[in-house]
Amino acid sequence: MKLITEKYPQIKKLFGYDPNFKWVVTGMVLVQIISLPFVTQLSWPMMLVVAYCFGGVINHSLMLAIHEIAHNLAFGHNRPLANKLFGFFANLPIGLPYQGNEVIDTDLPTLLEAKLFCTTGGKLLWLFLQPFFYSFRPLVVRPKPPTPMELINLVIQLFFDAVVIKLWGWKAIGYLLIGALMAMGVHPVAGHFVAEHYMFKKGYETYSYYGPLNWITFNVGYHNEHHDFPAVPGSKLPEVRRIAPEFYDTLPHHDSWSKVLYDFVMDPDIGPYARIKRKHHGLDS
């Protein structure tokens, strides 16, 4: 980061929040809520198709929005409470509390996962179960008591879920929850989970993705750029690459998240173990 900003100090002008971000997120939340009475008119099989192709994509994008909000990129770093409360609002259609914080190493598969899911069939099953591993792995790897704000988030979320069930029934809440879970598993937008850190080329531990799905995922594919400049909102990450191409264009990257998932399952040299774990000073290793 220092080397890049020394050569291109204009990148610092990209720091801060995107004033349009909160309106995009608000629109996504409203679309999900407005769709609920229509979803209840669908058969269960058709509802699942719509949840996979539409609702789940929006919910996954909202998860990525919450990650942006965790960086205080909705209202700026000087308004942390506003960011936190807006994160609660963005969370509503997901159905379950999602913090969006980067908890060190809890997204790394455990040794048991690496041993159990190392075959082609095992890796495919691991992708299907990925929502559950992401949800419960932190409770095993680095358990911690919930904070007051996390408890408030839980109460707000459960109240919203109860209102949805009261107004539109169990199919409506199922649409939100199932869509969110499906879009975290074997789904093109979930390819970023694997694409970002799994070592597809020896010696490179992080990878960006420069395909069209960035348009609906707040440019989460610009992963190297985000790691270098977490204070730059997703909408401006392509500008980082444009300003400093020699720092990014020479790195291996992905052009298709679907291909990432296919290669992950079919390539015997790639699996849940194909990640680099760094030691963090001051933390138990």
Regions found by a protein language model. Give the residues of each.
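Residue-level signal for cytosolic alpha-helical hairpin/rod architecture
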Residues: 86-87, 222
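Histidine-centered catalytic micro-motifs
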Residues: 62-71, 97-106, 193-199, 216-232, ...
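Transmembrane alpha-helical segments that form the membrane-embedded catalytic/substrate-channel core
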Residues: 54-66, 127, 131-136, 177-203, ...
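Short acidic-hydrophobic sequence patches enriched in Asp/Glu that either
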Residues: 80-85, 99, 182, 236
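Non-catalytic, topology-defining segments of multipass membrane proteins
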Residues: 1-56, 65, 88, 93-175, ...
